[in-house]
Amino acid sequence: MKKQTCNSIVIFVFLLVSSSVVYSQTASAPRNGSLVEEFSFSLKDFKIDHQGEKNNLNIAISYRYVANITKSEYPDFRWLAKDVETLLTNYPNEDDYWEIVNKRITSMLLTKYPAIASVTCEMGVEPSPKVPYTRSSRVTRKQSGK
């Protein structure tokens, strides 16, 4: 009987030591799941003199906010739209490819608006007399560390 009890204790200790331990992390996880906030707007039929001719652009901007943004930190999208229009109207290098123009837009928006964690700009350029093709550039840029 003692041998059977001893064997039972050995088996119990073996099972206890070899069993995996599971920790619940529900206390630290958000109750409603993770939150991702995004916003988007478009600039339609924006006229610009670039690359030696008049061009018609259609621009779609979408962006993701930083986590835990407060009400006072939300930028009014009209500010972003106006900043894009101003950058394009006063663009310094008329020879830049559209991809470079697009990279400057995303860089400017992330620099100026710290509440934005990432931004995507899709720029469509309609056919023109010199370039009879529809073209587009899509650039996504993220804040470092966000």
Set out the residue ranges of the language-model regions:
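Bacterial N-terminal signal peptides that target proteins for export
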Residues: 1-10
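Bacterial N-terminal signal peptides
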Residues: 9-19
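N-terminal, polar/charged subdomain of small-to-medium soluble alpha/beta proteins
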Residues: 23-146
